[in-house]
């Protein structure tokens, strides 16, 4: 067995797609295990950017299998659009496999997402309005429609009619909104199902067979640990489990078959939407980081909130996700700053704490305790080894590793594949 999990350690947008793409070169199967098209990842190949939301980053390797696992919620309309986009770019998708157990996002999920968010008023969570939460709600309530159901016209008709009856009562009676027509959904979405039918299978069999045969399998997480519904900044979280433990549920692969967990982080922190963010910057330094780092959401286009690197967050992520290796991205974005800061602990009502509180009220009162390091003026985008980094940048990388308590396997000085520097192979000793 040879398997590696890639997880985001912050609030998403850490560069997981880039690292997954990088590690995919030595994998034979690449699988996603949770989330939906609310998460976007950008891959740069030969200077060209590709933006994906559902399909795993490994799709760009035609000889490798890319898997959409059972833990995902799939909007068939978005998936077909993404497939067409790849085809137009000359990318084959013959290597894609979709779990027949994955749940389907339908228009009523998106409408319910919108209405629920509007009803919260000033207490909005900041959802992407992609229907993710309502789809997972239906899954937990055991009324969800799965990919396998979508492919069977009679079953899809029966379950869609049942669900629409219930949802329309909600829309009309609770939200004073307009009902959704069965006819507006049924034929269109059944046709989407037929367009993806060739890719649908029991992906748990594919993944376990690959591992049993000694093949290298890479699991690609979406969002980040701090958006995990159990371990994140609840309720400002996603509706699934991005933590490494989510792999076993979302892929049908047992925990004994997971070998390493790579935590991906940026040299600073960013967040989309509302919720606690102790190291958030509101000054010109924050604006500079946002602009240089192109911190705008892949899915929403919204400006991301940015702040200093938070080792409290990172140690929390390391603990709950069992991180064995770290990939540190976007060090180049900090170039040119006179000083750089790292949050080493929090001050909570005059007491120093080293853990991340569960209470939102406590988090609001947490003040970051910073360690300040000298910056570096040099352009480091051409650096190809740790030794080539300026001394101050090198010290920053080492200090991050010390504070998090995990060795750094790769560091990146730009978005390109060639700008990822290897300190040790993640696939070694497996």
Swiss-Prot record:
Cofactor comment: Binds 1 Mg(2+) ion per subunit.
Quaternary assembly: Homodimer.
Pathway: Purine metabolism; AMP biosynthesis via de novo pathway; AMP from IMP: step 1/2
Species the sequence originates in: Streptococcus sanguinis (strain SK36)
PROSITE patterns in the cross-refs: ADENYLOSUCCIN_SYN_1 (PS01266), ADENYLOSUCCIN_SYN_2 (PS00513)
Name of the protein this chain belongs to: Adenylosuccinate synthetase
A cellular component annotation (GO) from this entry: cytoplasm
Residues annotated as transmembrane: none
InterPro entries per the UniProt record, alphabetical: Adenylosuccin_syn_GTP-bd (IPR018220), Adenylosuccin_syn_Lys_AS (IPR033128), Adenylosuccinate_synth_dom1 (IPR042109), Adenylosuccinate_synth_dom2 (IPR042110), Adenylosuccinate_synth_dom3 (IPR042111), Adenylosuccinate_synthetase (IPR001114), P-loop_NTPase (IPR027417)
Positions bound to Mg(2+): 13, 40
GO biological process: 'de novo' AMP biosynthetic process; IMP metabolic process
EC numbers for this chain: 6.3.4.4
Keywords in alphabetical order: Cytoplasm, GTP-binding, Ligase, Magnesium, Metal-binding, Nucleotide-binding, Purine biosynthesis
Uppermost EC category: ligase
GO MF, one annotated term: GTP binding
UniProt record similarity statement: Belongs to the adenylosuccinate synthetase family.
Gene designation: purA
Binding site for IMP: 13-16, 38-41, 128, 142, 223, 238, 302
Localisation per UniProt entry: Cytoplasm
Positions bound to GTP: 12-18, 40-42, 304, 330-332, 412-414
């Amino acid at each position: 067995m040879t398997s590696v999990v890639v997880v985001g350690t912050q609030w998403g947008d850490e560069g997981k797609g880039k690292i997954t793409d990088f590690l995919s070169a030595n994998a034979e199967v690449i699988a996603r295990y949770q989330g939906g098209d609310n998460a976007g990842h950008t891959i740069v190949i030969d200077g060209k950017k590709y933006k994906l939301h559902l399909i795993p980053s490994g799709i760009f390797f035609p000889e490798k299998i890319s898997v959409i696992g059972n833990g995902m919620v799939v909007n068939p309309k978005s998936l077909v659009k993404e497939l067409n986009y790849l085809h137009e770019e000359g990318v084959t998708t013959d290597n894609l496999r979709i779990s027949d157990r994955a749940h389907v996002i339908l228009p009523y999920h998106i409408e319910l997402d919108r209405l629920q968010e509007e009803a919260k008023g000033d207490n909005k969570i900041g959802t992407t309005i992609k229907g993710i939460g309502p789809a997972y709600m239906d899954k937990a309530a055991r009324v969800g429609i799965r990919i396998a159901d979508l492919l069977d016209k009679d079953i899809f008709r029966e379950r869609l009619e049942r669900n629409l009856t219930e949802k329309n009562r909600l829309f009309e009676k609770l939200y004073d909104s307009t009902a959704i027509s069965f006819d507006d959904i049924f034929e269109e979405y059944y046709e989407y199902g037929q367009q993806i039918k060739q890719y649908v299978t029991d992906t748990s069999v594919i993944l376990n067979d690959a591992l049993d045969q000694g093949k290298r399998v890479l699991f690609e997480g979406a969002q980040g640990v701090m958006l995990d519904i159990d371990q994140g900044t609840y309720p400002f979280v996603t509706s699934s489990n991005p933590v490494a433990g989510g792999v076993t549920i979302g892929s049908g692969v047992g925990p004994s078959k997971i070998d390493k967990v790579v935590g991906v982080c940026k040299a600073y922190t960013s967040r989309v939407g509302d919720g606690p963010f102790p190291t958030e910057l509101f000054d010109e330094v924050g604006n500079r980081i946002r602009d240089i780092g192109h911190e705008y959401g892949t899915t929403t286009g919204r400006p991301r909130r940015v702040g200093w690197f938070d080792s409290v967050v990172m140690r929390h992520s390391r603990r709950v996700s069992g991180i064995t290796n770290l990939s540190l991205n976007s060090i180049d974005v900090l170039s040119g700053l006179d000083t750089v800061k790292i949050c080493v602990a929090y001050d909570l009502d005059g007491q120093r704490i080293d853990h991340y509180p569960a209470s939102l009220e406590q988090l609001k009162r947490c003040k970051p305790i910073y360690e300040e390091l000298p910056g570096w003026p040099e352009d480091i985008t051409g650096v190809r080894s740790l030794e080539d980094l300026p001394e101050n940048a090198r010290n920053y990388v080492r200090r991050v590793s010390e504070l998090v308590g995990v060795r750094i396997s790769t560091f990146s000085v730009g978005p390109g594949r060639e700008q990822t520097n290897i300190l040790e192979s993640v696939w070694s000793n497996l």
